[in-house]
Curated annotation (Swiss-Prot):
UniProt name for this protein: VWFA and cache domain-containing protein CG16868
Subcellular location: Membrane
GO molecular function term, any single one: voltage-gated calcium channel activity
Cellular component terms (Gene Ontology): voltage-gated calcium channel complex
Biased composition regions of type Polar residues, renumbered to the chain: 1370-1392
Location of the region described as Disordered in the Swiss-Prot/TrEMBL record: 1307-1339, 1352-1416
Extent of the signal sequence: 1-23
Domain VWFA: 320-541
Keywords associated with the record: Calcium, Calcium transport, Glycoprotein, Ion transport, Membrane, Repeat, Signal, Transmembrane, Transmembrane helix, Transport
Record field: compositional bias (Low complexity): 1359-1369
UniProt record similarity statement: Belongs to the calcium channel subunit alpha-2/delta family.
Length: 1449
């Protein structure tokens, strides 16, 4: 910076010459359109300030300038000294290093500028489509072979014997020869023999066995015998099926067929594995493309996991499911929950093309009407899309039982009336469409003669339909032994036994149709076996519809789903084989997309118009891969289907280009796209892949339109040093990151414990992400532990080979050169890390450098997860998005165990001989970074700016989105009730007044939004102007809080100084439960709110959905995929507790005596509280693991304390390796306390059981009126606001509140807590920032006025045997239950889906009425008469003891 003598002179000149400038435009993401910018009031004029007026007029802005000056100097020192940016840039310039990815993007841009077809891009498209076609063809061949196997061979298998073990070798022949031979002998279609066969669902996992070699020998034989034994057991257990008998020759026949299918699946798995093994010889990294091969049997309804049951049911096309649900009083609470769970199971099996309707019946019947979809609600039928199913589930959860018995006849009458109306309107066709009628009931009849009336109603309803439908009945019971009459009645309904009741059906019965064709199935849903019976019944109930006329006769490629067991994203290819079942294979989505996921572009470059790729489902236009999507590897739940029209904002894409993509086999088209204020030309190249998918590569021009006015020179030397030319060879001291493997060499590296990582200080480690390999999928899924060591040794030998004789082990061609260049840069970082004179040696956790190709080197060397990708981390993305600046991330949790950390990063540009680099022109090829503790920046503030230590002065640092990096609260301990430290603490969380006022500065910050279509949300966030040149202060004058904000030049950080004696007044509404915005109908620039999200309301199946979501596309850009903040480390065989601590990582915290010295030191925390929240008389510096967040022995986000950390927590002044007898003694004490506590619990439990008849608990909410709890039945009497049919009262919640009253402040409970606000209590609507302090006395006053809810068994009898009432003043009167509580500050109340249906259906309960005035029984309300002036009333709690009551009462 300038010398002090010249500083004042320069500022004087600026004060004279400066003039007010116009509001500057905030540089936003380039994909934002002008419609996304929130306009400000035209009459509003922000405060215009010149640098001179800032310096001389406002003293607070002088403090901001001082803070900015200090931080700029420290960041400059970090960039040059700690990150060694200048030196590393010299290395890249001397070696003329450039990235192949960047070169390809340049070629695309230059080609498109001249409107010439890009030959390189077309070659890539051809190559990618061929690879994808081969993978899908291989899968389709397997599926077709399985189909032929079942279609022509099963009916003949029982004639052959498979018990001869000598024939095992003959079955090794190729499957094609066997199929041809059997097909020649039998070309007839399947016969009726399948009726006598009971086939089992069989699933073979194609995952390689990590513990054994690929030789199958005896292991496969044992597997076959095991499968046969399992088949026999399953067949024995399935004796309840009425269609097959296993006590005759059919049992042996079924066993033979099941054994044959199992053998063929094993042989097919062997052949696929052998094929992959042969491919791996030619390609060192070759993936196994199959997850499962399977046969889903129609006999058992695909009794497997949810995903397989969905595949089985999806074979039945265009289904219509009608639910008739009994909600009468015969159902207990448990049975009613069982009914809801069964409907939920069935809904999960339906796909988007299916239809659903629902009718509830008790003494009255009602159709399901969803408010969120009024168009469909008018007809009572809904498509089974994900949005509809979620709303239906919410509706079902809101149902409650009625107080009257069930009128079964009325339920069937309403159901058939609905079917007739839908048939007349053409929405269903019972003659051509599969209809599933399911009646879920207790089956209790008021009179045995009611069964005849029900069958007459059914017969009359069937008569009005074009074709009769099959009815399935489900009895929900607690015990199957006491349902004799109910079982007979429901069995008659399912079988439509009209003959038994002499009902004439000749007038409508189809001619030539057998009675068995209308026979449905009767199921028993028992509470005792709910975990197994519900899933199995939900899929088996579709068995009668598994007919050839309802099934598809082509291959089906299903949308990707996340496997609940493994977490993999799978794509299934299936084929129906009537009448046996479904055959198919599961493929990895990451395998199909490996070329597209690592296509040379990042999300930021895709948004800026550079090349990218996407993959579409040709039948639906839904997207499988796009730069807006995260990697399948980190996807945790199945996303909503996203049409490509939602993501592409090019001109004429939705109206013209999209149709061409889905219709034409191949082609290209060029159109215009507006990115911000720029007009670019975007070209789409596409190719159809076997008719299933459409692969599209996109390139955009317009790089010449960028502003290239400024250049920045980072290398101050005119001459470039000649670094060591031999960066290959054995002298390269570099280790592969797999430190858990013995990598050979002269001496194995010395491993140690670095926080929670296995690390080494001997050398830096090399990590190669999946993008560095030719087959990224093979790298991620072929990591067999036994072969991994050999693979690691081969990679390192190839990288060190200077002769060029060793073969490439599957790496991309440019990786070897990048490793050598990055190694030279790492030597600079390693020497700086080991320098004992370094001023930041105790603060820097680790240093690393990563290339855009996914090569990472770090020191100290650490073990990383194989799924780690440095190019997708937030520090890498932010540095690439802001090249030439030193970028800092918001605090996040370190996977290595260092707690909350901040990453400081800087880009390295491609090498140039003249060493001149421009942030606008040059391409970044690498990012160098280091990690520091989260409090590091606040330590820098205290060291460089003494003014920040004064009272009423706050100094803050926040990054370009408003997340705090430094705040005075970092000096205070974090607890659940005070100073909660979030991983991402935003400015609006901590400084509400500053956030409210700074939103008036249009040239400082914009409130923006983006669309996340995968979870159907609109994300709101803040974007700060990183080109700000002035210092901004208060817009509203006269406020008690004065502030000044300035940009720290050359970075993405902003400095703020607040001078205030009282921070009261302003607040920003933030939800304490989730991220949902409190007002989704309004988004104004000056409305302060925390970063939040709003749901998108819409249905992807409606005809107008495309235009509906396209409207979002025109207004908001798509959100980038979430950054991969935390990726857990892989488990190792080495125990961390047995490893010695790495030098410098432990044992130094006790040497710091003050908080200032302890602040920001890695692995250290200033310990101020014990685990009970009590302050220490003398605080001390301790290890972070033992005093996380300043609380001794508190739990960390990593889990429980291990033995060494627990020892350190109870002995903070003792080193961890010192011996202490606390372990054995403490263990004995804990065991003794547990034994005594258990004995006391047993004694009190028995005592409470004896005196339970005398204990009463009163609750105004539940109105038990003093009944003993042992005699109070929650199922017989309900709350006064419960509806008879479709109400909104939760019995489980009511019972919990009666026994455990919630007396917790909602403002002092973390968002992750299990606390839930009482249903009739006042809601705070998430205004957490309004009460930053402890509970006030006002709340205690209100507590006195509320009824007493006792939940502690240790109360005295005089307390528990009493009724608590209150005399209420007019201002303290409770609201009527029919009117929900409203908040005066909100125009629209954020209610959940369940609560919405509760409010609509709320009616008084017939159990016990409420007074006409709406008052609650047990509450005394003083009367009000007109407007006459009344004297003041006294508010006092009154306790009436039951010992005072008379016998008559």
């Amino acid at each position: 910076m300038w010398p002090n003598s010249n500083l004042n002179a320069v500022l004087l000149i600026l004060a004279v010459l400066a003039c007010p400038t116009s509001s500057q435009h905030v540089p936003l993401a380039m994909a934002n359109s002008t419609s996304n910018q929130v306009p400000t009031d035209p009459g509003f004029m922000p405060l215009q300030q010149s640098p001179g007026s800032v310096f001389f007029v406002h003293h607070n802005q002088q403090n901001a300038m001082q803070l900015r000056h200090s931080m700029e100097g420290k960041l400059r020192n970090i960039r040059n000294t700690e990150l060694r940016v200048a030196k590393i840039q010299e290395i890249f310039d001397s070696m003329h290093f450039s990235s192949a990815k960047g070169a390809s993007n340049t070629r695309q841009a230059s080609s498109n500028d001249s409107n010439v077809v890009n030959p390189q891009l077309q070659r890539d498209l051809q190559l990618f489509s061929e690879r994808l076609s081969k993978k899908i063809q291989k899968a389709t061949y397997v599926v077709l072979e399985l189909r032929e196997l079942l279609r022509y061979n099963l009916t003949k298998v029982w004639q052959y014997s498979y018990d001869d073990e000598d024939d095992e070798s003959e079955s090794e022949m190729d499957l094609e020869m066997e199929l041809e031979d059997l097909h020649a002998r039998n070309t007839a279609s399947p016969t009726d023999e399948h009726v006598q066969l009971y086939l089992n669902t069989q699933i073979e996992s194609c995952q390689p066995d990590y513990e054994t070699d690929l030789e199958y020998g005896s292991s496969s034989t044992q597997s076959i015998h095991y499968n046969r034994q399992q088949i026999q057991i399953l067949n024995y257990l399935k004796s309840d099926d009425a269609r097959a008998t296993f006590l005759n020759e059919n049992n042996a026949r079924s066993l033979a067929v099941n054994g044959y299918i199992s053998n063929q699946l094993v042989l097919l798995k062997r052949r696929l594995s052998r094929s992959d093994a042969e491919n791996s010889n030619s390609k060192p990294i070759s993936g196994n493309h199959f997850k499962h091969i399977y046969f889903l049997s129609n006999s058992d309804g695909a009794s497997a996991s949810l995903h397989f049951r969905q595949l089985y049911v999806s074979a039945i096309k265009q289904k219509f499911v009608l639910f008739l649900i009994d909600v009468g009083s015969a159902l207990s609470a448990e049975l009613f929950d069982l009914s809801k769970s069964f409907v939920h199971e069935m809904l999960q099996l339906l796909e988007d093309t299916d239809k659903v309707s629902l009718v509830t019946v008790a003494s009255e019947a009602n159709f399901m009407s969803l408010e969120a979809f009024p168009a469909e609600a008018g007809h009572g039928i809904y498509s089974a899309t994900r949005a509809h199913k979620e709303e239906i589930i919410s509706f079902i959860n809101s149902l409650s039982r009625a107080q009257a018995f069930t009128n079964h006849s009325l339920g069937f009458e309403y159901s058939f009336e609905l079917l007739h109306r839908l048939q007349q309107s053409g929405m269903i066709n019972t003659a051509e469409q599969p209809v599933e009628f399911v009646y879920i009931t207790r089956g209790l009849l008021t009179n045995l003669s009611d069964a005849m009336a029900v069958l007459r109603v059914v017969a009359d309803g069937q008569r009005r339909l074009r074709a009769p439908v099959i009815i399935n009945t489900c009895a929900v019971v607690l015990d199957e032994k006491r349902i004799m009459y109910e079982k007979q009645f429901l069995n008659d309904v399912a079988s439509q036994n009209y003959t038994k009741y002499e009902i004439d059906v000749a007038s409508w019965w189809p001619s030539g149709q057998e009675a068995s064709e209308l026979v449905g199935r009767f199921y028993v849903l028992s509470k005792m076996h709910a975990e197994t019976s519900l899933p199995q019944t939900s899929s088996r109930i579709f068995g009668p519809l598994f007919q050839e006329r309802y099934l598809s006769d082509t291959l089906e490629v299903h949308p990707p789903v996340v496997d609940a067991d493994s977490g993999d994203v799978l794509v299934s290819i299936t084929h129906a084989v009537p009448p046996y079942g479904v055959v198919g294979v599961n493929l990895y989505l990451s395998d199909l997309l490996e070329d597209l996921l690592n296509y040379p572009s990042t999300t930021s470059s895709a948004k800026q118009g550079l090349g990218y790729a996407f993959l579409l489902d040709r039948s639906t236009g839904n997207t499988l891969a796009h730069p807006a999507f995260p990697r399948p590897l980190i996807q945790r739940e199945t996303s909503y289907p996203v049409n490509i029209a939602y993501l592409e904002n090019a001109t004429d894409f939705s109206s013209h280009i999209r149709d061409r993509l889905l219709r034409e086999e191949s082609g290209n088209v060029t159109t215009d796209v507006y990115v911000g204020r720029q007009r670019l030309q975007r070209t789409y190249y596409w190719q159809s892949v076997l008719g299933f998918y459409v692969l599209c590569l996109v390139s955009s021009g317009g790089d010449t339109l960028r502003n290239v006015s400024s250049t920045q020179r980072y290398n101050l030397k005119d001459t470039v040093s000649n670094y060591e030319p031999g960066y290959y060879g054995e002298s390269m001291d570099l280790l592969y990151h797999r430190l858990d493997l013995n990598q050979g060499g002269s001496a194995p590296p010395k491993t140690c414990r670095y926080f929670r990582q296995v690390a080494t200080m001997d050398a830096p480690t090399l990590f190669l992400s999946a993008a560095a390999f030719e087959s990224p999928f093979g790298f991620l899924h072929n990591n067999r532990p036994r072969t991994q060591l050999r693979h690691v040794e081969s990679i390192m030998a190839y990288l060190r080979d200077s002769s060029g004789l060793l073969a490439n082990m599957g790496l991309r061609p440019s990786i070897r050169h990048e490793v050598g260049v990055l190694y030279q840069a790492m030597q600079q970082l390693r020497r700086r890390h080991q320098d004992a004179r370094g001023s930041l040696r105790s603060h820097v956790i680790r240093r690393y450098i990563a290339s855009v190709s996914g090569v990472l080197q770090l020191y100290p060397g650490c073990l990383l997860s194989s799924s780690y990708d440095p190019t997708r981390r937030p520090w890498f993305r932010q540095a690439i998005a802001q090249p030439g600046k030193i970028v800092s991330t918001a605090p996040y949790l370190d996977a290595g165990g260092a707690g909350y950390i901040i990453t400081i990063a800087h880009t390295i540009f491609e090498g140039k001989a003249h060493a001149l680099h421009s942030a606008q022109q040059d391409r970044p090829v690498a990012v160098v970074a280091l990690d520091v503790p989260y409090a590091f920046y606040y330590r820098l503030i205290l060291e460089g700016t003494p003014i920040c230590q004064l009272p009423h002065i706050k100094c803050l640092l926040f990054e370009h989105e408003g997340y705090l990096l430094a705040h005075p609260s970092m000096l205070q301990p974090a607890t659940l009730t005070k100073n909660q430290r979030r991983p991402h603490e935003h400015l609006t969380h901590k400084e509400s007044y500053l956030a409210n006022d700074m939103l008036n500065h249009g040239q400082l910050v914009r409130k923006l939004g983006c669309a996340s279509y995968q979870n159907r949300t609109l994300q709101r966030y803040y974007a700060f102007n990183t080109s700000l040149s002035s210092i901004l202060g208060n817009v509203v004058h006269g406020e008690r809080t004065k502030y000044a904000i300035a940009l720290i030049r050359g970075s993405n950080l902003f400095a703020a100084v607040l001078n205030s004696s009282c921070d009261g007044g302003a607040f920003c509404p933030c939800s304490t439960i989730d991220r949902e915005c409190l007002n989704c109908k309004r988004m104004d620039q000056t409305d302060c709110e925390c970063p939040c999200e709003c749901p998108m309301v819409g249905d992807s199946s409606s005809p107008s959905s495309l235009m509906y979501f396209a409207n979002y596309t025109r207004q908001f850009p798509y959100c980038p995929p979430p950054s991969e903040h935390f990726i857990a480390l892989p488990p190792t065989t080495q125990l961390l507790s047995t490893l010695p601590n790495c030098p410098g990582s432990a044992g130094i915290c006790e040497t710091y005596s003050t908080q200032r010295e302890c602040l920001g030191v890695m692995g250290c925390e200033w310990c101020q509280l014990d685990v009970d929240g009590n302050s220490f008389s003398t605080s001390f510096c301790s290890s972070q693991a033992s005093c996380f967040n300043g609380v001794l022995a508190s739990l960390t986000p990593y889990g429980e304390l291990d033995e060494m950390e627990l020892l350190a927590a109870h002995n903070p002044q003792r080193e961890q390796h010192a011996y202490s007898a606390f372990g054995p003694l403490g263990g004995a004490i804990v065991v003794l306390v547990m034994v005594i506590g258990f004995a006391i619990y047993c004694y009190r439990h028995n005592l409470d059981a004896q005196t339970q008849e005398h204990f009463y608990v009163d609750s105004v909410q539940e109105e038990n009126y003093g009944l003993p709890l042992s005699r109070f039945n929650f199922d017989d009497c309900k709350a006064h606001d419960e509806p008879p049919l479709g109400g909104g009262y939760d019995h489980a919640s009511a019972q919990r509140q009666l026994m455990h009253a919630a007396d917790i402040s909602p403002y002092h409970v973390s968002s992750g807590s299990s606390y839930r606000r009482p249903p009739n209590g006042e809601s705070d609507h998430g205004y957490s920032t309004m009460t930053p302090h402890e509970d006030s006395s006002d709340q205690q006053c209100f507590t006195l006025a509320e009824p007493l809810l006792l939940h502690d068994k240790r109360h005295s009898k005089s307390d528990t045997m009493s009724i608590s009432t209150s005399i209420s003043s007019p201002t303290n009167r409770q609201q009527s239950s029919s009117q929900p509580n409203t908040h005066p500050y909100l125009s629209n109340q954020p209610t959940s889906k369940t609560e919405r249906y509760k409010q609509v259906q709320a009616t008084p309960s017939p159990c016990r009425g409420t007074p006409a005035g709406g008052s609650v029984y047990g509450q005394t309300t003083l009367p009000l008469e007109g407007d006459k002036t009344r004297p003041h009333y006294i508010l006092a709690p009154v306790t009436v003891h039951r010992h005072m009551e008379t016998a008559e009462s």
